């Protein structure tokens, strides 16, 4: 496995691989790898000749009072996990390499970024779209792998790829969960033992919504109320949002019809956790 830190070098490697007729699978991460990331790597290995992972904690997708400085980082640990899974190249650039002083461009996807995480983290998805487009241009992948846990991020990237005619296939991958249902996340390390117990309520609330829908409840506000009640019963919790959107258009709905994405963000202690499920109303 090769670690590459310079953009030019990464571009040259990608060019050479393409010349040799090799397909490239790309797994963009912010590091502090967990089983969710590794499941993306495994799928990439199945579908491509070469797998490239990027590890870059992207400063422009964090707001001024967010956790950029304390976001967990452990490159040596990440390196050994990636190597074990058979990653071929890690692209590990510095902030200066990605954003030199004269950097002036922002990629901004409209409308679908105005709700949910986009609403509570202004500018976040501009930062995501900008870094992902840069990474696509550097790595030139045939396929790129993203977890369904960040459902809105996935929608934003798909939209950008479609609108800008990018030649990369976006492969969504299922959420990987701990045994008690908590979605795997690098931010779970922020949780104390007690908070960790409370954190299972995100998935429980999503399942409560699913059960209500399966029993015929179609009114979003009634389902939301039940979810809120369940979440706020737990210690250390504060709800950022609970949103029901059409799974294809990402438009907010008030009545459950067809395929619905139910997404939430909840603070458990200091950690802001997100989760979602897709439910099909009969």
From Swiss-Prot:
Its EC number is 6.3.2.1. One of its GO terms (molecular function) is ATP binding. Beta-alanine binds at residue 61. The gene is panC. The keyword Cytoplasm applies. This is Pantothenate synthetase. GO terms for biological process: pantothenate biosynthetic process. Transmembrane segments: none annotated. GO terms for cellular component: cytosol. It comes from Caldicellulosiruptor bescii (strain ATCC BAA-1888 / DSM 6725 / KCTC 15123 / Z-1320) (Anaerocellum thermophilum).
């Amino acid at each position: 496995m090769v670690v590459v830190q310079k953009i030019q070098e990464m571009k040259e490697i990608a060019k050479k691989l393409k010349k040799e007729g090799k397909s490239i699978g790309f797994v963009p991460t912010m590091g502090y790898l967990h089983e969710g990331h590794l499941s993306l790597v495994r799928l990439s290995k199945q579908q491509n000749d070469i797998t490239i992972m990027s590890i870059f904690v992207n400063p422009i997708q964090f707001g001024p009072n967010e956790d950029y400085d304390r976001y967990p980082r452990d490159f040596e640990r990440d390196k050994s996990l990636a190597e074990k899974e058979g990653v071929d190249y890690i692209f590990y650039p510095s902030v200066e390499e990605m954003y030199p002083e004269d950097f002036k461009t922002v990629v901004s996807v409209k409308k679908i970024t105005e709700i949910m995480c986009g609403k509570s983290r202004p500018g976040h998805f501009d930062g995501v779209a900008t870094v992902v487009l840069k990474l696509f241009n550097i790595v030139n992948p045939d396929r790129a792998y993203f977890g369904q846990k960040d459902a809105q991020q996935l929608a934003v990237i798909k939209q950008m790829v479609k609108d800008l005619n990018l030649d990369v296939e976006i492969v969504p991958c299922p959420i990987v969960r701990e045994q008690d249902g908590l979605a795997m996340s690098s931010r779970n390390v922020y949780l104390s033992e007690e908070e960790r117990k409370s954190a299972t309520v995100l998935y429980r609330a999503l399942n409560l919504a699913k059960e209500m829908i399966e029993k015929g409840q179609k009114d979003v506000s009634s389902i939301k109320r039940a979810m809120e009640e369940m979440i706020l019963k737990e210690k250390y919790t504060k709800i950022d949002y609970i949103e029901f959107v059409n799974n294809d258009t990402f438009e907010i709905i008030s009545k459950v019809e067809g395929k619905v994405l139910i997404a939430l963000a909840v603070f458990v202690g200091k950690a802001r956790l997100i989760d979602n499920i897709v439910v099909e109303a009969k």
